[in-house]
């Protein structure tokens, strides 16, 4: 068994909640703004025994991991929670909160089990800081993508 690490990051997006929720809900597009995520594929609901199932591939620093994740709670325009089903043990949530007409807060919390093979090579505190920084950069790229798309919609 490995060590569990938790990371929390927050950003404020200068766009309405609807736009922010819509962009995040397109799980297959997450690799556009999550640099360590190589791909996310939605599993065909007709062939899967579990609802809301996705297959994730993470590739970073010479390591590659795959896992399936299931959305365990979906509150439209408010919250998504998930947990892994096999593969890399992970769980998390993202909470959206309107801060006025054009501002939306996005709070991402990710918890995962650090595999022993990585723990042997990396000190937990160093890895924890690196992952938190990467998640913050990812959520900031998400913010930039939503704001760019929203501004393009507003000017057309």
Predicted regions located by residue number:
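Hydrophobic beta-strand positions in extracellular immunoglobulin-like domains
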Residues: 13, 58, 110-112
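Hydrophobic ligand-binding cavity/cleft-lining segments
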Residues: 1-49, 152, 156
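Amphipathic alpha-helical segments that line or abut small-molecule/effector binding pockets
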Residues: 18-21, 136, 140
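Beta-strand/loop substructures that line and gate deep hydrophobic ligand-binding cavities in soluble
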Residues: 83-137, 153-156
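Short loop segments at secondary-structure junctions
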Residues: 14-18, 74-75, 99-101
